[in-house]
C-alpha cells in the first residue's frame, strides 16, 4: 500500500509541476537538449486520451528456470492502472502510465513510465507498434527502493483496445519474463 501511495504521490507531484508551468512555454526551465522530451510528455499529458490498463500474465522463460522454480512463481500478474496516450503527427504512439500488478512472488509492484511505439497501419482499425518504455518501479526483493528501467515494448492496436507485451531480460534464474498487458482508451 505504501508503494501505491508513493506512486500516486509521484504522479500528483508531476501533475502539479506541469500545472504550475505556463501554457505558452511549459518546458521553459528544461535544459535545451531535453526540451523536446518535455514537450512530448507535456503534449501527451494535456492532449492525450485517458487509458485504463490491465495486466494478467507474466510468462517465465522455460529455458532459464528449473521446472520446480517455475511452479513456485506467480504467472497471473493481475493488476491495472491509468494512463494518457496519443498518436503523434507521424502516427506513432506515445503513452504515460502508472500501473500496479502482482509480481512473480505475489507482491504488488508499482511502475510509472513513458512508452513510445513506432507504428504501422495494417488497415483503418488495426495498427502494430514496436518501441520501448522507460520506467521507475520498485520491488520487495530490492527493499522497495525505486529504480529506473528501460524495456522493449510491442503492441497491437484495434480501435480503442490494445494488447501489448514487453520482455524483461535477465540471467539464469532471474528476469527473462514476458509480461503481457492490455489497454482500453476511454
Swiss-Prot record:
It is found in: Cell outer membrane. InterPro entries: LipidA_acyl_PagP, OMP/PagP_b-brl. The keyword Signal applies. One of its GO terms (cellular component) is cell outer membrane. It catalyses: a lipid A + a 1,2-diacyl-sn-glycero-3-phosphocholine = a hepta-acyl lipid A + a 2-acyl-sn-glycero-3-phosphocholine; a lipid IVA + a 1,2-diacyl-sn-glycero-3-phosphocholine = a lipid IVB + a 2-acyl-sn-glycero-3-phosphocholine; a lipid IIA + a 1,2-diacyl-sn-glycero-3-phosphocholine = a lipid IIB + a 2-acyl-sn-glycero-3-phosphocholine. The record marks 69 as: Role in lipopolysaccharide recognition. It is an enzyme of class 2 (transferase). It comes from the Bacteria. The active site is at 60, 103, 104. GO terms for molecular function: acyltransferase activity. Keywords: Acyltransferase, Cell outer membrane, Membrane, Signal, Transferase. Its EC number is 2.3.1.251. The keyword Signal applies. Residues 1-18 form the signal peptide. GO terms for biological process: lipid A biosynthetic process. Pfam families: PagP. Homodimer. Transfers a fatty acid residue from the sn-1 position of a phospholipid to the N-linked hydroxyfatty acid chain on the proximal unit of lipid A or its precursors. Belongs to the lipid A palmitoyltransferase family. This is Lipid A acyltransferase PagP. The lineage of its organism: Bacteria, Pseudomonadati, Pseudomonadota, Gammaproteobacteria, Legionellales.
Amino acid at each position: 500500500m505504501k508503494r501505491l501511495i508513493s506512486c500516486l504521490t509521484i504522479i500528483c507531484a508531476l501533475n502539479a509541476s506541469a500545472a504550475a508551468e505556463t501554457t505558452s512555454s511549459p518546458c521553459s526551465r528544461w535544459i535545451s537538449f531535453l526540451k523536446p522530451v518535455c514537450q512530448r510528455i507535456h503534449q501527451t499529458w494535456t492532449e492525450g486520451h485517458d487509458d485504463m490498463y490491465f495486466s494478467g500474465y507474466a510468462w517465465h522463460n522455460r529455458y532459464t528456470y528449473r521446472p520446480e522454480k517455475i511452479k513456485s512463481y506467480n504467472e497471473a500478474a493481475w493488476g491495472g492502472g491509468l494512463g494518457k496516450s496519443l498518436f503523434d503527427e507521424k502516427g506513432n504512439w506515445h503513452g504515460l502510465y502508472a500501473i500496479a500488478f502482482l509480481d512473480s512472488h505475489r507482491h504488488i509492484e508499482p511502475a510509472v513510465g513513458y512508452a513510445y511505439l513506432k507504428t504501422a497501419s495494417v488497415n483503418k482499425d488495426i495498427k502494430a507498434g514496436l518501441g520501448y518504455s522507460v520506467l521507475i518501479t520498485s520491488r520487495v526483493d530490492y527493499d522497495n527502493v525505486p529504480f529506473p528501467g528501460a524495456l522493449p515494448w510491442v503492441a497491437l492496436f484495434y480501435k480503442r483496445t490494445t494488447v501489448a507485451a514487453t520482455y524483461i531480460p535477465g540471467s539464469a534464474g532471474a528476469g527473462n519474463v514476458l509480461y503481457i498487458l492490455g489497454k482500453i482508451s476511454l
